[in-house]
Each structure stands twice: as C-alpha cells, then as structure tokens.
Amino acid sequence: MHHSTRKRWLASIGAVAAVATLATGGAVTAQAADAPVIKNADVAYPSFKGSDDPMKTAANNTTYNPAVSYLQETFDNDVKNLAGIDTDHDFWIDKILTRTGAQPTGKGTNDKGAYSYEGSDGNNYLFTRGRAAYMYTHTPNQLGFVGDTAYWDQTSRSGFTVTVNADGSNQTLNEDASQRKQTPSYFTSLFQTGGKSLKIKEVKYITYNNVMVANLTVESTQDRDVTLTTASPFAAEGADGATELTGRVNVKNNLTTIYPRFSANNQDGSNWIVSGGKLTSTLSLKANEPQTVKIQLGLIANELPDSTKEYEARYTGDLKDAAASYKDSVTTYNKWWVDNAPYVDTPEDNIDKTVVYRWWLSRFNMLDANMPGNTFQYPTSIEGVLGYNNQIVLTSGMFMMDTKWFRNPEYSYGTWLSAGDTAKKSKAGYYYYHDNPGDPANWNHSYTQYITRAGWDSYKVHGGPSTVAEELADQGAEDVQGLLASKSEPDNNDNQNNNDNSLIDWSWWSMTGNDADAVSFSEPGRSGQRMDRADGSANMWANANAAAQAYKAAGDTANAEKMQAIADKIQKEVTTELWDKSDNLLKHKWLNDGAFAKYKEINNYYPYSEGLMPTGNEDYNKALRLFEDSNEFPIFPFFTANQADKAALNFPGSNNFSIINAQPLLQVYSAGIRNYDAAKNGYITNEQFKKLLYWVAFAHYQGGDNNYPDQNEFWNEDNNNVGDVNGDGVINNLDKNLDAAQNGGKITYRSWIHHTQLGTTNWTMVEDVAGMVPREDNKIELNPIEIPGWNYFTVNNLRYHDQDVSIVWDKDGSHYGGPAGYSLYVGGKLAFTSDKLAHLIYDPAAGTVEVKDDSSAQVTVGAEAVKNVKAANQVTFNADQRVTDLFAKSGTNVDSASKSTTNVAKDADVTGTTYAEKDTNYPAKNAVDGKTVMESFWGTKGSENKTDTLNIKFKDGKQKIDDIRLYFYQSSSSQTISGYAEPANYKLEYQKDDGTWAPIADQVRTPNYAGANYNRIQFTPVETTTIRVTFTPQAGMAVGVKEIEAYNTGIKADGTSENQTPQVDAYVSSSTSSGAKLVGTVKDDGLPAEGDVTTTWSQVSGPEGGTAKFVDASAASTTVTFNKEGDYVLKLTASDGEKEGSKEITVHGIPSDGTVNVAPQSSASASYTNGYQPKDNAKKVIDGQVVYANTPNETWNNWGDSTGVEPWLQLKWAGKVPLKKAKVFFWTDGGGVPMVSSWKLQYADADGNWQDVKLADGQSYTVNRNEGNEVKFADAVETDKLRVVFPKGAIVGASEFEAYAIEPVSVDEVNRLVQTGSKADDLKLPSTVSAVYTDGSRRDLAVTWGKVTDAQLAADAVFDVKGTVAGALNGTVAHIAARSDTASQTVGNAQPVEQTVYQNAKSIDLPATVPVKFPNGYNDDRKVTWKDADIKAIDLTKVGDYEVAGTVDDGSSSAAAKLTVHVVADPNGSSTPEPEPEPLVGWIEGKATRTTISPDSEATWSPAEGKLNDGVVVDDTWPTTDDQNVNDKVWGSWGKAKDGMYAQYDFGQSVTIDQSRAQFWANFAETDDSKGGLEVPDAWKIQYLAEDGSWKDVEPTEDYTVVRNSPASRADTDAKGWSAVTFKPVTTKSLRLVLTPYTGSSTFGAAVAEWGVHGIDGTEPEPTPVDKTALESALDTANGLDASRYTAASWAEFQQIIDAAQAVYDDANATAEQVAEQVTKLEDGQKALVALATDVEKSTLQAAIDAAKAEAASGKYTDKSVEALNKAIEAAEGVLKVGEVGEVTQAAVQEASASLNKAVKALEEKPAAETVKKESLEASIEQAKKADKSKYTEEAWQALQSQIAAAQKVYDDKDAKQADVDAAQDALDKAFWATKVEQKPGSQQPGVTDTDKDDKDNKGDRVPPTGAAVSVVAAAAVLLTAAGVTILKRRQSGDHGSARHSA
C-alpha cells in the first residue's frame, strides 16, 4: 500500500537483522572483514558524458557584467533574437534544459564502457506546469494532455484527448518519438499516419495560471477535409452548437473547487462547436498548406482570478491566435528566471547545469495554488510532485536552504508560514510542525526538521519588519516546546521525548527521513527500542537557537532568553549524554539501558553541520576522522549509513543514497573545513570538498549523460554486479560502493519518483563556494571555501536586504575582464576587491572591510560603493508585494502603508454563544490569541442556533479601527477537524457609547463572500470599545473562527460597499434509483444588514409527466427523487430580500426503486483498521465520497491486520431499519492493499447473532473495480447492524459502503403540549416514531431528537425540535408548546390525519395516535382506536379515498378522529405484467447485456470492452509477422495476466447454455520466453452463476481444446482457430471464461479475440411421475433400527434425516433428484450412527488393562517405554470411567484396546549402562590451563577462562553424557586457538605499494578510525581449521532486502 512510511519498506526487518546477527556471530565490530582502507583523498573524479557544451554557452553571446543581471541581459538578447516565436527559437534556460527524443532508456557509459541501469525516465514526464496544474503522469505518444492530470494532486483523468477523422474514418496517428522535444516551458512532437499523408505537429504548454493549451499544426499531402474532435473529462457540459464546454470538479480531499472551461480556435479565429459533450471542427486542407488550431482547457479557480483572465484571453481575447498564445506563455515562463533565480558560473559546466536544473526543480516542485483554508494557501515547496506530493516537514527546511536565494521572499517565507499555519496541537498545548494535512495519505507525522533555522536564514537574506521575525519565532518556539513535551500524543511516532530530557528520541527509522538506511536502528536485539538521537536533537537545537535570535530581533528579550536557555540545555545534553569519550564520537543512546548505539550514520554528525558542537575542542575535531576513510563515509556514493557498520551487520535494511544524504555531507564538509580543523587534520580536505561537488552533480545525470538530469528520490547500487573489487575475499556492498566511484562512476538503480527534490545543493554554491553568509545587520560577510584549481566563478542576480548583489572570483582578471581577485558588487556598484579568497566582513556605511582569517588578504574598497545597505529589520513590504498578502493570511500586518500594524483585538475580553464556552478544546479566547494556526479556533460544532455570535471587548479600552480581519477554519482532508466551513454570511457591529449596537457602515469585503481563512473588511473608521460578529453557518456545517483582528490602518479601501447578489453554487454528488444527492452552497455579503437569506430548490424542466420530489426544498443540500427517467433541470435560488441569485444544474433522473441509502445515518466500525490510519477511519465508508485513486486516508483498509479473524466492516443504526439492498465500492492501491477477491453480507438477527443475507434470485457478490458492487436481498432484512465479511487473512480496502432501506412515504410528527416551567426531561419525546410505507405497513423507527433545554420551557414558547430517524432521510419534527394554561386544557378536537398506500397493497396499518387541538390552540398527541367497519371498507385494489373514524382513547376529544386513506396507483408499477423473454438460442454472445473482467486483468491499451463479442475473429487479415499490434482487436492482459483471470457475460435473463468457444492469439509464431508478449493460455474453463450466488464449473462432456492462433497460424486449422468445449447444459444469467495464462521468464499476457456462447431452449418439459420405491425401502430399513444401540446425539441427527426423507416421500411434487438425494442421505446417515460399546467389549478392555499394569510393574523395561504404556493404561481406564456415568462408544473402546496393545508391544528392555570417555577432555583442559596470556586479546583470554571452567564442570559431572563431554571439548579447543595474528606491514589498498612512510599518515596521537579491519577473525579461522574445527560461513545471497517500493 501507499501509506505515510517513507521511501523503502522491508517485508521483515526483524528477519533481516536476525540473519545479520548470525552472519557476524553477534559481533558488533565496525567492520566484519579485512577490507583495505581506501582514503577518500584517493577517490577519483567522475566522468561526464553527453554534450561538450551542457550550458549552451555557444548559443549565448551575452557579455557578462557583474554590475547588472546576466539573466536579464540574456533574456533581453533572447527576445531580440525572436525567442518565443516558435519552437526553433528558444530562450537560453530552455535550451540548457532541453530534452529530445524518448531518451534515456537505461543505457549508460563510463570510462570502462557501457552498462545498464534501472529507472530511466524516457523523457516521458511533462516539464511544463502551472502554479497548481501539471501532469502527474504523461502519455507523450498521444495527442492532447493524456495521462493523470493533477490539480495540486492527481485527478485520475486526462486533460483532454484529440481524435482525427479523414476520408470517412478515424485516423491513427503515431508519434515520431525522434521529433519529441521538451523544455521547461513547452513540449512538442510530431504525429503522422502510416503513409505520412497526414501529420500533426503538437506544441503544448501549461500557463502560469493553469490553462492547458495545445497548438496543433495539421498538414496533408493532398486536398482533404479533416475533422478534429477533442474531449475533456473535466468539462463536458454545454449545449450542442455552443462554443464552450464547462464543468465542476472538487479536487482531491475537497481542498478547493475548480470550474473548468474548454474551448478551441481555428486558424481563422473561428471557434470549434460543441457536439455531444465534445468540441469539433472540420478543416478544409489544401495539399501541403498547414493550418494551426489551438485547444485550451482552463482549470479555473475562484481564488485565482487570473486563471479566468488567462483562459478568456485565449478563448476570445488577444491571445486567441495560437502563435500569440504560445509566445506569451513561454516568454512569461522564462522571465521568471530573471525575476527570481541567481546565476552561477564556475569552471565546471556540468556542475553549472545541475545548478540550473536544481533551480528548475525548486520551481517544478513548488505549489502556489492560493487555496483558501488550512492546507495550501501559501506558495509552498513540495516533496515530489510526481511522487509523495506533499509539504513534508522533514524536507521543508532543506528546500528553503535553496529557495531563500530566490530573489523574491515569497517562496521561502511561504514555506515556513505554511508549516506554521498547519502545525498540529500537542497534548501539552503547543503547536509543532506536522506534515501538511492537505494530503494525509502521503506523510502524516512530525519528522526531524530545521524549518525555523532555515526560516531564520531566509529572514537574514530577505528581511522585513520585526513582526516577520516575531512570527517565525512564535511558531519555532511552539514547535520546540511541543516536541520537548511530547509524550502522550495519539500517534506514538509523534512522541519524541519520552524520558523528559532535552533530547529527541525515536524508535522508528522513518523519523530520520532515511528509513531502513539508518543502520543504528538495526542493532540486534534492539528492535522497537527508543534512542536519544543526535540528528533530531541537533535540528531541534538549531530551531531553538533560531527562535531565540528571531525573538531578539523582534525585541522580545524575555522569550529570546527563554529559547536560548532551551537551546543551551539541548547543546549541553548532546555534548555530554551523546558524546562517547571512549572513542571520541557522537553516538545515539538507547533509553532503556543508557548504552550507546553501536552503529552510525551521517546523522550522527548533524550537531556539526548545524554548528551545535563547540569549536576549538581537539576531541570534538577528531570525531571527523571517519570522513577520511571511504570504507566509513565515502565521498561517493554518499550513503546514510556508515558503510563499515553496514558491513558489520551484513548490510541489513536498505543501502540507498540520495541528495538527502549529499546535503548534510556537504554541510559536514564545509563545517569541518571552516570550524573543526578537518582540512588541517587531513580528515576533510578542500580537494575532497571539490570532489563531492563533482560527484553530487554526476548523480543527477542518468547514465552519466549530462543531457538527462533527473533527481530521483534515491539511488543505489544493489543491482550492480561486481566481483571482489577491494580484494578482501568477500563480495558485498563495499565492492559495489567502490565500483560505483571507479572508471568515471555509475549508478545502477534510480528510484521511481522522478524530478523530485529530496535535499538541496544550490545553497552550497552561493554560501560555500561564493562564500555568502546571511546576517541580520547591514554588513555583508563573505567566507568562501577555496576550490582547488578553480581560478574563477561568479554568483550574480542575488537579492540581499533589498539590494542586488554579485560575487566574482577572477584570480588574474582574465576570465571576466574585471578586477583581478575576489570582488563584491552591491546595487550595481563595486563594493570591494580582495586579492585572494578570504573571510571578509564588509561595512557599507563605514566603507571598510575586515579580514577575519589569517590570509593577509589585501582589500580595495570601490570608489562608488553603495553605502545605504539596510539591516534585515529595515526592509519594508508594500501592498503590491505578494509577501504582504502572505503575512496577512497568517495574521500579521506588514503593509508599510498601514498607520498602525498593532492588532488591538489580540488578547481581548471575548465571549461567544454560551453553548460553545463549554467546549474547552475550542474556546472563544482562541479567536483572539494572536494565532492563525489551524487548530486554534473558536468552534460552534454542536450549536443548534440559527446564528452564533462573538463579542470582542478591547483590552485597552476604546480604539479607532478601520480594518477587521476574520480567519475561518475549513474542514477538508481526514487530518482536519471535520464539520467546519466558513459561514454562509456574517455581520459586523460595533457598540456605541450608549451601549447600543450599530452595523459597521460602508464595509468593503475581500472577498465579497466569506472565504476560508483570511477575510478582510475595510470600512469608514469607528471608535468603540467592543465589536460583535454574528455568523450564519452553512447548512450542516459549524463555524470555526481562528482569529479576529482589528487595526487602524488609515488605508482607504478599494472596492464597493453595495449589496451583492447572493452567491449560489450547486452540483450533483450522485444519482441512483434511490435519488440524486444535490450539494448546494449559498453565501451572502451580509447585506442588507437586517436581511436573512432564504434558499429554495425548484424544478425548471423535465421529461413529460416527470416530477422531481425534494426531501427538503429549503435546504441548500438535499436529496431529490424522480418518478420518470429523463433529464431534469433543477434550480437552487437564494434571496437576501433585495437580490436573488440562482444556479441551474442538469440531473439525469432515475425513477425511484423505493429505497434510500441510510448508511450515512449509521456508525461504521471495522474488525481492524490500518495502524497508519486514524482509528475511526471506518467512518470514511459512509461519508458519501467514492474514491478510487490512491488516497488511503480517505478510505478504509486493514493493511497490517494480523488478528487472525475474518475481516469485517460494519454499519450500526440507532434502531432497526428495513434493508433491501447494499452496494460496496472497493479500493485498492495495487500493492499492499489488493483488490477484494470475495465478500458476503451478514446481518444481526433479533438475538444479536450474525446471519448470512439471502440474496434475490440471480444476484451474486461481484468484485468490480472502479464501480459499485450491488446486491439485492431476497426479502427485507430488519436489523440494526449490517456488515461485510471478507475471507480470513484477506487485506482489503473499501471506499464506500451503502445500505438501502425501504423508503417510507411519510413519518409521523410528534406534538407535545406541556406546562410552562416543565423540565426538558418531562417532555418524554418518544424513542421511535411511526413510518408509513407504500405497501400499507408501518414500522416504528428509532429517532434521535435535537437538544431541548429547561430554558426553552421556562416561559411560554412554541418551537420545533428536529428528529433524525433511522431509515428515513427526511426525519421528523416534534412541535413543542409550553403554555401556562396547559393544566386547564382537558378536552379538545382530534385533528384529521391522512395516510397514503399504493394500490394492491396486501394490508394497511393505521396510526396509533392523532393530534388533539385544545382550546388554547395547541396540539398534543393522544392514543386512538379506529372503527373496524371503516377499516374493512377500504378496498386496496381500487384507487380512491377512504375515510376511517376513530375514538380518542382517553376522552380528551369531543369529536371523532378522522383518517383519510389515499389508495393511489404505484407510479413505478405496470398495468400489464412483463412478458417472459424468448429463450436465447444459437450463438448468443452478441446478446450479452454487459461484459466485465476480473479486477486488474487487462492492459489499459487493450481493454476487453467491445472486443469479445464484436464478431471480429481471427482471419487472414491478421498479422503474418511477429510482435505486431492487435490491441484494438483483442482483450489483452500483457503485464496483468494472473491465474484465474476471467471475462464475464451478463445476459439479463436466464439462458441455457451447452457449448462455448474462444479464439486466442499469440503475437509470436513460436513462444519465446526471452521476449514475452501475448500468448495462448495454458488452460481455460467455463463457469456459470448458480442459483445460490456461487460460481461453479460446468461439467464437460468433451475435453476442452486449446488452439493456438499466431502469425504462423491464423484460424487455418479444422477448428477455424476456435478453442471449444461442450458440457452438460446449465441455466444461468451470467457466464465466465476463466483463464490459466501462460507464464515464462519474461512478461506474458493472454489475448482473446472472440468468446462465443451457445444457447439452447431450456424450457422445462412436463414432469413425469417419480419412482419412490427405493425411498420407501430405505425408510422401512431406517425405521426398523434399534435406537438404544446408538448414542443419543447420533440417533437424533439420524431421526432428522428420517423426517426429511419422509417429507420428500409425502411431497407429490418431489423430483427424482430430490428422491435420490434422500435415499443417499438415509444410507449415509445410517453409516454415521455411533454404536455404543457392549458389556463384553468393556470386560475385554478391563482384562487388557490389568495385564498391561503387570508388565509395567515388572521393572524389565526402559522408563520411556513404560511411561508410554502407563499413558495408554490411563487413557483406557478413562474410557471405562466415562461408561460408568454416561455413554461409551464402541469405537472408543476399540481404539483404547488397540492403543494399549500397541504400547505393550512397544516395550523396550533396559540396555547395559553407557561408558563415558573423558580422557580427551582432560587433555584439552590441561593444555588450556598452560596457555600464554600474551598471545590473546583480553576478550579472547576471558573467553578461554570461561570455557576452561565450563569444561571442568562437565568433567566433574558423573552423570554427564558422551555428547556433553564432546561439546565441552570442542568449545574449549576453539577458545584455546583464538590467539592474535601477527600484524604484517604494508598497504591494504590494491595496487598501492608500501612506500609512503611519512609521519603525516601515522601520527602517534591520531585516534584510529572505527571500523578498522580486524584480522583476528581471519587468523583464527586458519588456526581452527588446523585444529579440525570448521567455520561455517554464513553469507546471505542475492537481494539483501532493499525494497524499491514505498509502503
């Protein structure tokens, strides 16, 4: 499955760890074998293949000038050179990243030659994208946008398709993939017919605001008319003849709604025409004169108004022309680079190209959907838009390290603002960073991260008012304190400080982001244990430290000191608790025993990369020694795990590497060089740093080819087949690692997520290579790491503190033509030049440069240097800047034009509607706490008020305000709090000085109607102490107010304050025979101030005689039923009293079948729910949302279920409901949660026991994918519980479980008249209400009433209480009247009542009560008795009205009760019965009403639909050569074939069938296992649907034949290519063709061209008399048996068989089969009788027992055999003892006798005593005692002493066995020979001689690296072999467990 666990999933890590432990003998040495030390310093550089000019410098003649933007200059030159006019004139960045053809294909080359790799992208992924729209998958060989279109995430539909018709037929156009070309801004390719007489050049692109455009240039070699048709599943609504199609789509997880618009233009400007939900146009082409048309699909979102502008400009505006549209889009796209991206140039173009590519990755993986709400309202960096596709906190900080260098702050600021606003509330009350709730299916935790630290760095780059720093500090402080307090979170993985210290602890490797690569978790015996972690703690320290600095910048000294104290405590505990002094290393530490974790990762060094470790400490510096050794932490591959530790454990888990590893390695390298003397000590040199830059660049290029960059999620060398590369005698991952970095390098596996970002590297080019150091003040600091051999580089187009900045290194001035040396340019002016690379701090105001290192650099300050560089907090933002809006969304006013940015409503005295004050989770104070974080809100859930109110009294008294901001909570995904939406409208008032309330006048609202999250209301200033907001909720939703803010801005509003028309939207959620669900939304602007909004549904049109019946016409969302099938136009109208808005929708109405889906009224539960889902996720199956896409958290599944019970999914109602059918929608992710194989329904009977539901005739349990699986019941099932049951052990998923109850005609209402002052409990509203059904019956259905309070009854009042009725969607109502004169109301008048019943009902039940109206005018229900004569007079066979009189039982009515019964015709009935269908005879496959196939058993390009019975059979027109395309003729299952796959015909009536045949096809003349392909199945069979709903095999009367059709044999056999079978006739409604497909070493699939079915007339002949003679004889025999000779139980069962047989004998209609069956049952029953033992048999057994006892007591036999005999004696005595008190069977006595005899025969006589020889053991003991201690290690010596003691103990044991003696001697000898091996001089590196004896490599004070080779193991092996001891080599072969699929 696809749940939140990251990257790689292991089937059984415990098993892998166990194998590792065995393989190493439990050893914990760092390295298991004597691998030669390979220094990273000796690692070579990679070799890049592909283009000699990867940066396309030859195509760019722009002269570099650091004083201006090189990208701007280049862009301007591109425009001058006509870039953008067509695809032959590209912009420079597009040229650099251009991809052509369908390359690469998995073939790479290095210096050694060619090699293969897995995971190439084939140029299949579409680069062009909009801010929210893109192609998640892309099918480039089809015209249009074909694949899975994403709007922020997958929609599971193509954008649009294009078909071509010419010469009267549809044309097949094939892509010429060699002509494929794509750049970041567009994609183009060529399509043509087979004869190339017709070709189309397609150019497609997606505009910034999500308009998907395809320009098609159509050309023909001859004059002809060509008709083009385009269709989009997004937009198919529109009248024929119109020029545009529209649609409406709720995007995934209901995050927003898009309103697609679809149109197309011809070259002459005319529009395409709508026809049948598609757009079409006919082009009259002249030979070789091309015409260009343009198709556009606008994915319009209300929150992106420019999406409408961009679409309309192309539909009818100035971009209607195809060329103009294209130029606008690609030009806009490429201008973005100028506005945002820094330019980097170095001596290595291959690195420079990765810089460009990575800027593009940051852009491609950025979501900027501006969705209002709590998910993606900010521009946000996403991890893997082609993969996980979520803002994941683990990687958000990494992405900001790059995006902070974008010139606009919105990208980095947006990411940390998003993380802050979606933070999760902890049990301790803090809000900690948590993965974005927009996509809970892909990551849903709080992982290690440094968001606050990265955010603080971004602030130091871009700056802003101090309130920006304060915002960051607040969210950072919440996060750190939340993590430190996390011990009791519902998700245990979110508990990260279980021992109350200041360190992060985890038990799950995914928290690191490295999953099974994190070797520390694989320590044997530690599975599931927690450890304090260096990585998470370092990141938390960085965040705490950043929060402290941000508070300090904001002027909040108290909080700054608080957070600094927390940071200092974390630092202290890391350096004390996690520092292992014994070997000078940081290590993780196990919580349970305080032991250091033995195994390490790069993660152990995060305290270095984050700067936590103090500098100047030689011990701390020595910890970096491991980076000197490639066997520990190689430069490449840059793994997570210390490779020596991985080797010591035999490489458990996975061993991947990724940019997520390269990033911290770069950080460790740079920190080590700068701060920890790593270069000085030789651990990490500048040369190594350079190599790492090169290898990081190399990793991006597929096959090492610089034409094809692709960052995958991870890479590995698992499938790299190598020998013993390092010469250690063992072939393992160390050899693969070494091979990967040799011969120029190679990567053999690239993972499945393409063009993702997991880690970043561009920051190192700016900060480490160029040396830019972000600061708060107005100084500029440079601190570069010198790259050996690089004599020049530049970083240009930087934006820093609101200034343009360039950095240039030109050693001798020859490369760029400027000053020689190291120069800084600010604001277009030279600031200074240093003669060398050095650590420098430039003070612009003073015009000075401070040299901070010992370089003795000589610096010259520029004469015109800019002096007014701002400090970070001096940077301002205006209203036009995007960043101002972002902060407004987060509750911070940074608009520089604002008179005051102080929110006067913060911490106000706030009161809300009284009911809500009781909800401590969401109290009113949350609305003024200064937080817009999503879970801090005041909520009205549970309120039954029409409106709810908040009063805000300012804490500082009267305030002048002109700007109020409201932030509303919005529910969306499963990780948001359900049931909340922005209000339908809200009203603002202020309190005047006299205490009265007045509406705030002249309101200008943005948006006009309430929106999720941010709403701004500007108005004429008022002075007040208190404001009030009144909210009207949307139907069925509560209102959540995250924050209310009030400002005095002095800014005049733009916009209107006039009343706006109510906003109305509506759509059809679903439409079935149980009604259509209508979802409506009505919003208003709150004007007029005293007005109320009303809503009404009405029918505009429909089929003749068709009527739409609304369950509640006044509700915005309701259900409607129809009496006739057809199209209905329905209208939702909303009025505010002045203006009216409406929305019309079209519904295809299906006549009601008399049922309604009552599942939403139930509560859902399951036997087990996936542990990664919310515990109550079963509720998703009744939420009304059918989901087929891979969204686990929006569905239910039981992945991980090990309960051992049959999985079930249950619905429970408040009372019994009459169910008639059910429908289940199954869900699969195609992996861990497979498609359901079978299921059944059960209901709870009256006793609560589960019973199988009996299905109606012809019904069966189907398992169809992507549609509902419906079953109808034989009879109504009256129950309060229904469940789906799956096979035991099944892993299953379900999206929706619908249960349909008989729909009542009406439900009785309730009337109560009570005394004023009564208590609510005195109302005693009934627990059930009576529901009336069309068949005349009534049922008492459970009702749940709304809340009634004592306050409502305290004074005279009249009100209604709604009741939810189980089984009735429209519910009921109780009319309550509280009157002070109630006691005097004794006699009233019974009110007339009515009841409707359908004609021909069997009977009618009448109401038990009637309302009686009393003199005060109010009703009360009283019991009634109806007149029998009137009831009998009702003629249910005739339509008419009938009156029934009745008497109120208690005499409270002075008049007779009156009931009018309306007998009406059944609108769904028929006056004449349907005739029986004629039998289908002959070959009837064409008469099948439906064809389906088994789940997931067809190739998408070769579906079964329309193929199997289309009459297209194999003939001589089929291919004669191998491997030709027949996909349009067959049901093909290549890649999907599996045993038991089937095709199914449904006939819609009973048919009798006696033959079937099929034509199979193989696409190779001979089966070729090496090629695979389509192949004839090994076997096939026919199954039919039996009456009991099961599938049964037919009984062949002739064997099945299998005929092979192929290019060598095209139906030219005697059988004409048919495989056939004849069988005993079966009568059924459905038939299956079941296949056993061929399997081979390659991928195969079955192909079926045609499937024939032969029917015969199955009409039953008149029955002949049945012969019952045999049954009569069998009954006589049975009745003559003596019951006393058998056990009572067996006789009772036999008697039932006799009774059943007698009943058949007495049945005149019994068939011959039934008679024969009873004869057989009587015979079998008699055989099953259990005979009782006779007295003789029991006496014989007793004698045998006595004899056996004598033998047992004789003492002649072994104890073991006597023990077995005694058990047999005991068992035999037990049998006889049973006979004393009850029945003992003959079989039991016989069995006991046999067992006893067997035990006697098995007695064994005692052998002579064993002689044990101990001489050899004695000799070994004496030898060991003389051992020389100096020849042993201390550990080996202690082991020897232990073995001596153990051997002596065995020697002294007189009862010791020979085996014990031998084992003791073996163990002692092994320990004796475990001596040390003599160390040999010389290098361990293959090919290197031992000539370098320089002391620099052998310093006496050097701490040796961990993981050094331990040669003792090898020596001991030799010695032990000499001693006759064999060492068992255990080595796991093949794949070591690295899974390539995310769980």
From Swiss-Prot:
Q: Which residues form the FIVAR domain?
A: 1678-1716, 1746-1790, 1823-1864
- Temperature dependence (free text): Optimum temperature is 30 degrees Celsius.
Q: Which residues cross the membrane?
A: 1908-1928
Q: Which GO terms describe its molecular function?
A: hydrolase activity, acting on glycosyl bonds
> Positions of the region Disordered?
1875-1906
* Bilayer topology annotation: Single-pass type I membrane protein
Q: Where is the F5/8 type C domain?
A: 892-1049, 1142-1302
Q: Which domain of life is it from?
A: Bacteria
Check the UniProt entry and state the signal peptide residues, or none. Answer: 1-32
Catalysis performed (reactions): 4-O-(beta-L-arabinofuranosyl-(1->2)-beta-L-arabinofuranosyl-(1->2)-beta-L-arabinofuranosyl)-(2S,4S)-4-hydroxyproline + H2O = 4-O-(beta-L-arabinofuranosyl)-(2S,4S)-4-hydroxyproline + beta-L-arabinofuranosyl-(1->2)-beta-L-arabinofuranose
Which regions are flagged for Basic and acidic residues bias?
A: 1890-1902
Q: GO cellular component annotations, sorted alphabetically?
A: membrane
Keywords attached to this entry: Carbohydrate metabolism, Glycosidase, Hydrolase, Membrane, Polysaccharide degradation, Repeat, Signal, Transmembrane, Transmembrane helix
E.C. no: 3.2.1.187
One Gene Ontology BP term is: polysaccharide catabolic process
Q: Which residues form the PKD domain?
A: 1061-1157
Q: How does pH shape activity?
A: Optimum pH is 5.5-6.0.
**Subcellular localization(s) per the UniProt record:** Membrane
The record's account of how the chain is modified after translation: Predicted to be exported by the Tat system. The position of the signal peptide cleavage has not been experimentally proven.
Reported function: Beta-L-arabinobiosidase that removes L-arabinofuranose-beta-1,2-L-arabinofuranose disaccharide from various substrates such as carrot extensin and potato lectin. Also acts on L-arabinofuranose (Ara)-beta-1,2-Ara-beta-1,2-Ara-beta-Hyp (Ara(3)-Hyp) but not on Ara-beta-1,3-Ara-beta-1,2-Ara-beta-1,2-Ara-beta--Hyp (Ara(4)-Hyp) or Ara-beta-1,2-Ara-beta-Hyp (Ara(2)-Hyp), suggesting a specificity for unmodified Ara(3)-Hyp substrate. In the presence of 1-alkanols, shows transglycosylation activity, retaining the anomeric configuration of the arabinofuranose residue.
Alphabetical list of NCBIfam families matching this protein: betaarabinsidaseHypBA2 (NF041578)
- What family is reported? Belongs to the glycosyl hydrolase 121 family.
Q: What name does this protein carry?
A: Beta-L-arabinobiosidase
Organism, by scientific name, is Bifidobacterium longum subsp. longum (strain ATCC 15707 / DSM 20219 / JCM 1217 / NCTC 11818 / E194b)
